């Protein structure tokens, strides 16, 4: 085959491989409605894992094909550049060009073991950056105007959903939504508003989300409705979210990816950007399940920051870890985590174990309590960007992962993660209600992780962070395990009075044994924290609490986990109004509810 024909064949093979991958991605995503209708929550969890694995699987298939057809050209740099040019020529009219570029990068990295990662060989920057703002041909959303009032508008919106289940009480849910809108906006502003709703539902866990925009003359607000399925197979709306902070949490970096049918992901990302202005492009792609392209965008955001900030990398604030070396740029919103060459003596584990823990988190339901990460190999940093103190620490702690490249160093493996304030630092500075909220959040994080079959292992405050919305998120994964793998035990009574004074336990301790009573020693040691913890979370110190959760997990029960406060649920917010919340909201205008 002539060289130019071979180069084109390779480019076409890579793009065809991506087509196959994204086709399967959409196929799994399209099954979300059926899984929701059938309440097959275990299938929901399996589909999430399968969709994540798809990408690497198809990259591997393409790499095997290319190794068979490259005819020894793999080491010819000019040949590789021509392949990329051919691939670029295939993309101008390609609907998912931006993710196809990331797929090319992944194939290249797999073929060449993450070496020679330069802009001429990879799509480190997009070949068509202007296309993401182009009007897409397929309408993503539909407008709803309250010409006859909000009651018929919302009734139409909900009854037109593709879900093939009856409503528990549609009129009640419509009243709830209208009451929330009146309470939030007031009747006068609501009368001037209309909705723009995404055509596709956003599925995650046990909810199907309607995602839309509440358009007002002077503003555009998020409009989010989580639809749930009752145990009797009936639909109900659990709440209505119209605040930017609430929407940001729903699409947060600590949550599992949505299943939303998006044949044109760039168009959906641009549409979402208006109601999620605090989210980066990487975070938006991550939220809709395009996590590998989100990694590309995350790296581009990092490069953009470097171009516009003259800062040096420093060790991240907080207590130094026993397994990870963590560093950051002072003004950047992410941290860089490198597994140390040697762990502290009490950490009896291997690097392979740590990597497996991070992969577990990637694939598991993170329930809003575990930060997502992007994994990089051969990550290059200019030496001038590294503070002398950090350089010394890198050489001391992760020297085996460093390669000297003259004016740069390469780190063979690291994770990038969203930066948070370490909880121990937050608690040192918090007072009053802020302290109380943080302790409540910490306990809720532990409970929700446990309900999702995750035991953090090391529950010290330093292993948790606080987000900009005040949520507590777990981020130290080296001791993480499934709840069902742990043996929760009560401490046996002492045999003799002197047993309690002994430095050694008077009872046997096997691998996997955990004694929740011991949590009290380090979680309640601070006198300003202890009473709050005892008040709100004392059951966490009881082995019976943990064993009861294990029983539910083993029986196959999947807990409900909400992306909003319990008090925001309609059934809690208006539980004393018998489905008629308008009694709690003053001056609901007839025009607003369509009754005048």
Curated annotation (Swiss-Prot):
Q: What is this protein called?
A: Isocitrate dehydrogenase kinase/phosphatase
What biological function has been recorded for the protein in this entry?
Answer: Bifunctional enzyme which can phosphorylate or dephosphorylate isocitrate dehydrogenase (IDH) on a specific serine residue. This is a regulatory mechanism which enables bacteria to bypass the Krebs cycle via the glyoxylate shunt in response to the source of carbon. When bacteria are grown on glucose, IDH is fully active and unphosphorylated, but when grown on acetate or ethanol, the activity of IDH declines drastically concomitant with its phosphorylation.
Residues annotated as the enzyme's active site: 372
Q: Which NCBIfam families match?
A: PRK02946.1
Q: Which organism is it from?
A: Cronobacter sakazakii (strain ATCC BAA-894)
Q: Tell me, which GO biological process terms does this entry list?
A: glucose metabolic process; glyoxylate cycle; tricarboxylic acid cycle
Q: State one molecular function term (GO).
A: phosphoprotein phosphatase activity
State if Cytoplasm is listed as a keyword. Answer: yes
